[in-house]
């Protein structure tokens, strides 16, 4: 093809590309809010798949799986077992431990187990526990549901565990700050990072620099959210090394896990 013809063809492709981009921008501008959520989610999901990366070598999951339930029995389990698990994990000197189980009530059947678990949490000095938002009779709207006081005092940190799925049921983001507007909780993942890296950005107490938006039925509510972040997934559900609860409890995992 002559050079002049190639130049004209390239110019036409450039012009068509600009036109297509302008039309897409116009469609996005004219579309009602949320109308392009599907395409946006598709593009985001494809981008995350393209950016899949190896799991961080310092992150390990301990799962309450079917084999553990078959061996130990149905849930809930005795808190003495959780205390033993924490002791086993803490012996490996991890940077942080997230125990994503809410212990908001005393154990009526085995009250001595509460003391054992609190002692294991305190001895570790690395355990973060979850905080929930509850809206039911007996709790004010948006009130936090915390672990028992003995567990709260023993824990190195608390963090909220709320996520809001998109319209298609997929969780693509979370709020790093959520809770009572005057003192929101960090997300549990951020709480874990701050235990492991206390000098990391956002780990020191800071005054709120962004406005908090109240959630609920449109009227001001005590529960608020802040700092929405997209989740940069490293990979699929089985991407991170995962060990069975019962195997960890029995010490049947590699010492360098």
Say what each PLM segment does.
Residues 225-227, 234-257:
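Acidic, S/T/G-rich, low-cysteine, solvent-exposed domains in lumenal/extracellular/periplasmic regions
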Residues 113, 229-230:
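Conserved acidic
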Residues 2-224, 253, 257:
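Non-transmembrane functional regions of envelope-associated proteins
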